[in-house]
C-alpha cells in the first residue's frame, strides 16, 4: 500500500508513474492519495495520523494491520512522521530497531 499525502491535489505528483506501477503489479499495489487542505470526491481528506487513528485509512486500503504481518515505513514531513509514529505506538505497534524487530521504521524528509 502506497499512501501519498499532500496539502493540495496539485501536489499529487507521479500519477502516471504510479498508474503504470499499478498496472504492472496488478493487484499487488494499492495507491491511496490523501489531501489535507481540500475535499475531493475520490480522495481521502485529512492528516495521516487522524485517518489512521479513526480507521478511515485502513478502510480505504481494505486492510486491517496486525502485529504479526504488518510493517509501516514512514517518510516525509517531520511533524507527520512524529504524529504518525505516536499513533502507531498507541495502537500497539513497536518501532523497528536493529536489536529487536518492530512494526515500523521512519525517516524525515523535508
Each model region followed by its residue ranges:
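Reductase modules of NAD(P)H-dependent flavoproteins
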Residues: 3, 8-110
Amino acid at each position: 500500500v502506497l499512501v501519498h499525502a499532500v496539502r493540495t491535489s496539485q501536489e499529487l505528483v507521479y500519477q502516471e508513474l504510479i498508474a503504470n506501477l499499478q498496472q504492472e503489479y496488478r493487484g499487488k499495489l494499492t495507491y491511496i492519495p490523501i489531501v489535507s487542505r481540500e475535499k475531493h470526491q475520490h480522495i481521502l481528506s485529512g492528516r495521516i495520523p487522524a485517518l489512521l487513528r479513526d480507521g478511515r485509512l485502513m478502510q480505504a486500503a481494505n486492510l486491517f494491520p496486525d502485529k504479526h504481518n504488518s510493517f509501516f515505513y514512514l517518510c516525509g514531513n517531520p511533524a507527520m512522521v512524529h504524529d504518525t509514529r505516536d499513533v502507531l505506538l498507541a495502537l500497539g505497534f513497536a518501532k523497528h530497531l536493529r536489536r529487536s524487530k518492530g512494526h515500523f521504521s521512519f525517516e524525515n524528509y523535508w
